[in-house]
């Protein structure tokens, strides 16, 4: 008897570069697995905006770093994510940005605002938690 095994597709950053997907969706790769989600809703984005406003106020006062909404982080060919909010010190930010303006390593702080749905929750509470831990993110906040 012959057995067959199916190897799951392992997505890469190069695949996303040529992928002509629906631009109203968010495409992320974690450990080669493709996660496709709808664009965040108004409430989700309002929460992100409020968080960034507070971080920006603090950053302007302290002069220590910068915050951003939805920056791409390309950790590797098989790990490419778009967190809701990040904060990075000026010192670290200089080392992290590539020529295209993407982060290429861990910022100090990553914040994800939970969207409804088991798949979204699993991605943020499990897959992204593991990824950010392994890649050196110092603080990971999940806002629900």
Positions of the model-derived regions?
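Gly/Pro/Ser/Thr-rich low-complexity, intrinsically disordered segments predominantly at protein N-termini
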Residues: 1-144
């Amino acid at each position: 008897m012959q057995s067959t095994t199916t190897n799951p597709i392992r997505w890469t950053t190069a695949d996303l570069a040529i992928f002509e997907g629906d631009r109203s969706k968010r495409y992320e790769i974690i450990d080669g697995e493709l996660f496709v989600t709808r664009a965040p809703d108004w409430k989700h984005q309002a929460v992100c905006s409020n968080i960034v406003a507070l971080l920006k106020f603090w950053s302007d006062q302290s002069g220590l770093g910068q915050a951003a909404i939805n920056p791409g982080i390309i950790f590797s060919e098989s790990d490419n994510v778009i967190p809701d909010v990040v904060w990075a010190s000026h010192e670290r930010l200089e080392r992290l940005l590539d020529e295209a303006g993407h982060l290429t390593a861990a910022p100090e702080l990553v914040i994800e605002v939970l969207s409804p749905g088991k798949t979204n929750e699993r991605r943020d509470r499990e897959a992204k938690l593991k990824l950010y831990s392994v890649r050196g993110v110092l603080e990971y906040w999940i806002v629900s």
